[in-house]
UniProtKB/Swiss-Prot annotation:
Gene designation: CDC10
Identification of the protein by name: Cell division control protein 10
Subcellular location: Membrane; Bud neck
UniProt entry keywords in alphabetical sequence: Acetylation, Cell cycle, Cell division, GTP-binding, Membrane, Nucleotide-binding, Phosphoprotein
Molecular functions per Gene Ontology: 1-phosphatidylinositol binding; GTP binding; GTPase activity; molecular adaptor activity; phosphatidylinositol-4-phosphate binding; phosphatidylinositol-5-phosphate binding; structural constituent of cytoskeleton
Similarity comment: Belongs to the TRAFAC class TrmE-Era-EngA-EngB-Septin-like GTPase superfamily. Septin GTPase family.
Length: 322
């Protein structure tokens, strides 16, 4: 019999319920998602996260209040942990903020604490995997996505952005966004996006999403459409305002009102659709299969080489003693 042939059972067996069994287990366990925000203060990082998940997950500094900045002149890691429930689906979310990034006169190597943190999470996961009696479900603290905030200044990438993106895109799924994009006109926004896309190509950054041979034509087309929008021009708001009898999430300015859910005013809806509704699971899987696997392979090779070196040294020592 052809091993690939399809056979219809003569009567009902019941293995079609496996999807229900998987769903039940996943609903019971919940999903883990770890998202990091990187960018200078005053770009609306906290507000955007809270707007994306329609929940107050992290506090934000008011404006550019210097007192809200870290005392030490280094990038810090501030982690907020929450559980969100929507229609029986439980999402365990860690939001990793990086206060201090790019906020000082000397920002050289501001990315190093971020890179160190990401690698440490991979290392912790690997250690738990290699223990003799490992946990059935290893707590996953690996960073699944990084929202990287760019200044809405219409200029080329800064040296800090270039150096940070070069390193972060090698070890994590980076999604660039233009913070507080309502400070730009629509034409300025379009020109700025094209400029930044050219910069990404110039520096050969591996911006998420990635294509692979496993993707269908429909999925490849979706990725192409997403890449045409990156960096997302975003505006966030936790407040509801009313204009002409219509209530929406947004904020009022001196001249007009910004509706964050209006695709003609910003890309918030597109970012939410991409990040949460179409690519959330892929972000988690890509972190595991690409970024973590690469780290794991390098670590295991290094361990093997160290073991071989010690073995060779031991054999040489015995030979000398003889």
């Amino acid at each position: 019999m052809d091993p690939l042939s399809s056979v219809q059972p003569a009567s009902y067996v019941g293995f079609d319920t496996i999807t229900n069994q998987i769903e039940h287990r996943l609903l019971k366990k919940g999903f883990q998602f770890n998202i990091m925000v990187v960018g200078q203060s005053g770009l609306g990082k906290s507000t955007l996260i809270n707007t994306l998940f329609a929940s107050h997950l992290i506090d934000s500094a008011t404006g550019d209040d210097i007192s809200a900045l870290p005392v030490t002149k280094t990038t810090e890691m501030k982690i907020s942990t929450h559980t969100l429930v929507e229609d029986r689906v439980r999402l365990n979310i860690n939001v990793i903020d990086t206060p201090g990034f790019g906020d000082f006169i000397d920002n050289s190597k501001a990315w190093e604490p971020i890179v160190k943190y990401i690698k440490e999470q991979h290392s912790q996961y690997l250690r738990k995997e290699l223990t003799a009696q490992r946990e059935r479900f290893i707590t996953d603290t690996r960073v699944h996505a990084i929202l990287y905030f760019l200044q809405p200044n219409g200029k080329e990438l800064s040296r800090l952005d270039v150096e940070a993106l070069k390193r972060l895109t090698e070890i994590a799924n980076v999604i660039p966004v233009i913070g507080k994009s309502d400070t730009l006109t629509l034409d300025e926004r379009t020109e700025f996006r094209e400029l930044i896309q050219n910069e990404f190509e110039k520096y050969n950054f591996k911006i998420y999403p990635y294509d692979s041979e496993e993707l269908t034509d429909e999925e490849l087309e979706l990725n192409r459409s997403v890449r045409s929008i990156i960096p997302f021009a975003v505006v966030g708001s936790e407040n509801e305002i009313e204009i002409n009898g219509e209530t929406f999430r947004g904020r009022k300015t001196r001249w007009s009102a910004i509706n964050v859910e209006d695709i003609n005013q910003c890309d918030f809806v597109y970012l939410r659709e991409f990040l949460i509704r179409t690519h959330l699971q892929d972000l988690i899987e890509t972190t595991s299969y690409i970024h973590y696997e690469g780290f794991r392979a390098r670590q295991l090779i290094a361990l093997k080489e160290n073991a071989n070196s010690r073995s060779s040294a031991h054999m040489s020592s015995n030979a000398i003693q003889r």
